[in-house]
Design a protein with these regions (language model features):
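Rossmann-fold cofactor-recognition segment
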Residues: 19-34
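C-terminal helical subdomain
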Residues: 148, 164-188
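Substrate-binding pocket helix/loop in short-chain dehydrogenase/reductase
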Residues: 64-65, 69-77
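Active-site loop immediately N-terminal to the catalytic Tyr-X3-Lys motif
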Residues: 66, 115-119
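Residue(s) in the substrate-gating loop at a strand-loop-helix junction
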Residues: 108
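Conserved glycine-rich Rossmann-like NAD(P)H-binding loop of the short-chain dehydrogenase/reductase
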Residues: 1-13
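Active-site helix of classical SDR
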Residues: 88, 124
Length: 188
């Protein structure tokens, strides 16, 4: 496989891409619609063909205030939901014209059930669930598979911020293996 990766943290991207010659990094802030399109064009130009896009956008800032923080919720939606929408919009025409491919959207179990101090995160992931279900039909007419992945608690920098019990906490490697198996075996 040849893999293109994108994220805001360029130093992390560089570290990952230097560890494997089949991985190339393309820095990107998914909140920038224009940049999403530009980066996808760069990826297409570099590889010539794209078969799978895997969108795992996310930010999580637990809030313990007793009042709702509207600005914080808007920021979480800007990254988690609209960042994914921007990314999918950037690839939409390509996949529909190609009449094949897989678009994978990473949500969370938090999209199905609220979590403590999570007035932005859970609702943003719930919105992704609904988006994926809608796109399943819209892209399906073009033979493009839309998959929704809703993992439980995965040990990451984001979950390190949690101060509540996280049952069945798994490593990112474990999650990646399960997600890969599900996509390859069409269990999504």
């Amino acid at each position: 496989w040849n893999v293109a990766i994108s994220a805001r943290r360029e130093n992390t991207l560089k570290e990952i891409s230097e560890s494997n010659e089949n991985i190339k990094s393309f820095p990107l802030d998914v909140t920038d619609k224009t940049k999403c399109k530009e980066v996808f064009e760069q990826i297409k130009n570099h590889y010539g063909n794209v078969d799978i896009c895997f969108f795992s956008t996310g930010t999580w800032n637990p809030k313990k205030e007793k009042d709702i923080d509207v600005e914080q919720i808007e920021n979480v939606f800007k990254v988690n939901f609209f960042g994914t929408v921007n990314s999918i919009k950037a690839v939409e025409e390509y996949f529909k014209n190609k009449n094949s491919g897989i678009i994978t959207i990473v949500s969370s179990i938090a999209g199905y059930r609220g979590l403590p101090n999570s007035t932005g995160y859970g609702p943003s992931k719930s919105a992704l669930n609904n988006l994926a279900e809608s796109l399943y039909f819209d892209f399906g007419r073009h033979n493009v598979r839309v998959c929704l992945v809703s993992p439980g608690f995965i040990k990451t920098q984001m979950t390190d911020k949690n101060d509540f019990k996280m049952p069945f906490l798994k490593t990112s490697e474990f999650a990646a293996d399960k997600i890969y198996d599900g996509l390859i075996n069409k269990n999504s």
